[in-house]
Structures are given as structure tokens and as C-alpha cells.
């Protein structure tokens, strides 16, 4: 195969390994880097198992998570790949979105088939919106019986179907991460087949800049003679002078206005783009009509809501979370983007209480509306300290 040269023009995709403990997620991650390194050492460093397994701890929204980041390139793409050593780390990562995934490689041991954590990870992938799954049927070298391999594959497809993934269409690739690490040509090829499945099956993600404009408001002030300016970091999309925008959230009524100026570091610009910290001058808006916690966005692209369902991770005592459980009708602050709003928690039927360190589903009613959509992340706070992290899974009202 001809050597792929490193070009920043390759599309970038975020990916990760998920699945039951000891089914070989970390070994597979190491094998991918080794096979690609052997094929093309100039652009692909080899990351050994030990290095991935001893992933450094990161803090995301006050939660400690061990995540290993590796990167590699196929001919078509540049991948950033995350692997978490511990089961709890996976759950925390998926709920807090410390590392976003455009697709996941579900690792299932061919010798054991789907296990409890396999199910839990697939369910979480569904709830936190991991859009595509590719299956690596690992340890396929130790299963001699073709019928058993077919049975396990069928089981995995049924499991994916039961969580609303297209189980019949998902690529299932038989691999042996260990044999590939040892350099066995048959199993080295299996890793390349798996990567081809990722290249072909996981679509290129829509870049933030191509999405509809949205900027959370951090600050509001008045420029005498010019009007009201709101500042913040553009979350997605592009805003240009002359664009019509809406101001959504907190207040009962959504306001429509026009952008009369965009500035960055006190310089006037034609436009602000995703990632920029900017000030936006708004026509005919009074200082008291807007506040921190609202968003400025493309008209009709997002709506205000007060009631939603969420998947939440509750910080353990060691992470600085609560020392005691909470019960139904718990009333903490929900921190969305730039502001706190009080809300009431309704626990699922049959759940008496939630302990620190648990993950749970809940229904929340906020006392003020927030501009939200499915997938929006938030923190749960008490008196300014974070006690949980969650993600909106369904909007109710």
C-alpha cells in the first residue's frame, strides 16, 4: 500500500472503544496503533497497552475521569480515539461528554458474547447520542467453532436492535487484538478491515461552523449612542452583520432583533465564527431585556423549555460531591451554559433515592425556561459546587 502523507485536509473523526471489562478494549486500541504504525510509521506512532492502561486522570466539570487519548490516521481520515480503563470512567465520560464520540467501536469477546456492561454501554451510547456503532468481535482466534461465532454475532446484532441501533446493518468484524499485536498477518489484516468499516460506516461529522449560529450570553453592557452589546463565545455557526437573530431563554418571550455590529478584541469584524469570543451589537434592544444565561441564535434553531428527561451522573463524596443521597423532589440548581436555574427532580418509578457515585435517569422541571435541545449538557450544583453532571435525553415541555 502506498504511504499516506500527513495532510491536515483529512476529515477529523472522534471515536472510542466501549464494551465489557476484559473483552479487550485497551488491547484493541493498542493493536490499532501498532498495525497502522507498522504500515506507515511516519504518521502513526505506536501506543503500547501499558501507556493506554495508565491513562492520566482528567477533570471535566469537577468530575475525575481517567481517559486515554490516542490518535491515528487511515488513508481517508484522522481519528482521535478515546479509551477508558475503568467501567465507572466510561459512564462518567459518556454522560459528561468529556470526550465526544462521532462513533464507537463496541468490543465484544467472541468467547463470552455480550455481558452486562456490554448492554450498559450500548444503552448509554443510545441515551447520550453516540450516533454510530461498529462491532469488533474480539478474541476470534480462540473460538474454533464457526457456529459459535455466528451465534455471538447474532446476539450482538439483537442487542443493538433492542436499543434502537440498526443491528442488521452494523458492520461486525472478527478480530484478534492480541494476535495482531504479535504481528500475525491474518489478524493484522482483521484490524485493517475494522478500520475500513469505521471509514465507510461512520459518516463525517457536521462541523460546528456548519451548524446554525448559537452564542450563550455571558455579559451585557451598553455602548452610549450605539446600543446594547452581548458578549460570549460562539458555540456553533457563523454570525454576520445584518443577520436576524433571536434571544432565547430565561424570559417568557423570545425576542427578535438584528445584528448591527460584531467585534473581537475591540476590533470590528464582518463575522464571528464558532470558537470566537465576540461582542454582538443588537438593534433596538434595551439593556434590561437581555441577561446572562440566554442565547443569541439563528431564528427558529432552538426553543425554550422547562421540562425534560435526563441521564445524570452524581459525583461521589471523594469527587467533592454530596455525602448523602438525595430523594424525589430534590431542588438543586441546574447550570446550563452560563447560568444556574432552580429545578425539581422527579426520580423514576421504583427509585427511592440516588447515592453519590450513582448514575440515574430523572425528569426535571425548571422554574425558568432554558434554550435547549436533546443532547445539551448541564451541571447540577448546590451553593456553587458541582454535585452532578447530566445530559438532556428528551424534551417534554
From Swiss-Prot:
Ranges for the region named G2 are: 62-66
Q: Please give the superkingdom of this protein's source.
A: Bacteria
Question: Per the database record, which ranges form the tr-type G domain?
Answer: 10-206
Give the start-end ranges of region G1: 19-26
> Main EC class of this protein?
hydrolase
Chain segments carrying region G3: 83-86
Q: Where does GTP bind?
A: 19-26, 83-87, 138-141
Catalytic activity, as annotated: GTP + H2O = GDP + phosphate + H(+)
Give the subcellular location: Cytoplasm
Enumerate the GO terms in the molecular function aspect.
GTP binding; GTPase activity; translation elongation factor activity
Q: Does the keyword Cell division apply?
A: no
Which sites bind Mg(2+)?
A: 26
Q: Which InterPro entries match?
A: EF-Tu_GTP-bd (IPR041709), EF-Tu_GTPase (IPR050055), EFTu-like_2 (IPR004161), EFTU_2 (IPR033720), G_TR_CS (IPR031157), P-loop_NTPase (IPR027417), Small_GTP-bd (IPR005225), T_Tr_GTP-bd_dom (IPR000795)
Annotated region described as G5, given as residue ranges: 176-178
Record region (G4): 138-141
Question: Quick check: keyword Signal in the entry?
Answer: no
Q: Which GO terms describe its cellular component?
A: cytosol
Enzyme Commission code: 3.6.5.3
Similarity section:
Belongs to the TRAFAC class translation factor GTPase superfamily. Classic translation factor GTPase family. EF-Tu/EF-1A subfamily.
According to its UniProt entry, what is the function of this protein? GTP hydrolase that promotes the GTP-dependent binding of aminoacyl-tRNA to the A-site of ribosomes during protein biosynthesis.
Protein name (Swiss-Prot/TrEMBL): Elongation factor Tu
Q: Which organism is it from?
A: Acidothermus cellulolyticus (strain ATCC 43068 / DSM 8971 / 11B)
Question: Lineage in the entry?
Answer: Bacteria, Bacillati, Actinomycetota, Actinomycetes, Acidothermales
Amino acid at each position: 500500500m502506498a504511504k499516506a502523507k500527513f495532510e491536515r485536509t483529512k476529515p477529523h473523526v472522534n471515536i472510542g472503544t466501549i464494551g465489557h471489562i476484559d473483552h479487550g478494549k485497551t488491547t484493541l486500541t493498542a493493536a490499532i496503533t501498532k498495525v497502522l504504525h507498522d504500515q506507515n510509521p511516519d504518521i502513526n506512532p505506536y501506543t503500547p497497552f501499558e501507556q493506554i492502561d495508565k491513562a492520566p486522570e482528567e477533570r471535566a466539570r469537577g468530575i475525575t475521569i481517567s481517559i486515554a487519548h490516542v490518535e491515528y490516521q487511515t488513508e481517508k481520515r484522522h481519528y482521535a480515539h478515546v479509551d477508558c480503563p475503568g467501567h465507572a470512567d466510561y459512564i462518567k465520560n459518556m454522560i459528561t461528554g468529556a470526550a465526544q464520540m462521532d462513533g464507537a467501536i463496541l468490543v465484544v469477546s467472541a468467547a463470552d458474547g455480550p455481558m452486562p456492561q456490554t448492554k450498559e454501554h450500548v444503552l448509554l451510547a443510545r441515551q447520550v447520542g453516540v450516533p454510530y456503532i461498529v462491532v469488533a468481535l474480539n478474541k476470534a482466534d480462540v473460538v474454533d467453532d464457526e457456529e459459535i461465532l455466528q451465534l455471538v454475532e447474532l446476539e450482538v446484532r439483537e442487542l443493538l436492535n433492542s436499543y434502537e441501533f440498526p443491528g442488521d446493518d452494523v458492520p461486525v468484524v472478527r478480530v484478534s487484538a492480541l494476535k495482531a499485536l504479535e504481528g500475525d498477518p491474518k489478524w493484522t489484516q482483521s484490524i485493517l478491515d475494522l478500520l475500513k468499516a469505521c471509514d465507510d460506516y461512520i459518516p463525517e461529522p457536521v462541523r460546528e461552523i456548519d451548524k446554525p449560529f448559537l452564542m450563550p450570553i455571558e455579559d451585557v453592557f451598553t455602548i452610549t449612542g450605539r446600543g446594547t452589546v452581548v458578549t460570549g463565545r460562539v458555540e456553533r455557526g457563523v454570525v454576520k452583520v445584518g443577520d436576524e437573530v433571536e434571544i432565547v431563554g430565561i424570559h417568557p418571550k423570545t425576542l427578535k432583533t438584528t445584528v448591527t455590529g460584531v467585534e473581537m478584541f475591540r476590533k470590528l469584524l464582518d463575522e464571528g465564527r464558532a470558537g470566537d469570543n465576540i461582542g454582538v451589537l443588537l438593534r433596538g434592544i434595551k439593556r434590561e431585556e437581555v441577561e446572562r444565561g440566554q442565547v443569541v441564535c439563528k431564528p427558529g434553531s432552538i426553543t425554550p423549555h422547562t421540562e425534560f428527561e435526563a441521564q445524570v451522573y452524581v459525583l461521589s463524596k471523594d469527587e467533592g460531591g454530596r455525602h448523602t443521597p438525595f430523594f424525589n423532589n430534590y431542588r438543586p440548581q441546574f447550570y446550563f451554559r452560563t447560568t444556574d436555574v432552580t429545578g425539581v427532580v422527579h426520580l423514576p418509578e421504583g427509585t427511592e433515592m440516588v447515592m453519590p457515585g450513582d448514575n440515574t435517569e430523572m425528569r426535571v422541571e425548571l422554574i425558568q425556561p432554558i434554550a435547549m435541545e436533546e443532547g445539551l449538557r448541564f451541571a447540577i450544583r448546590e451553593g456553587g459546587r458541582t454535585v452532578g453532571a447530566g445530559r438532556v435525553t428528551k424534551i417534554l415541555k
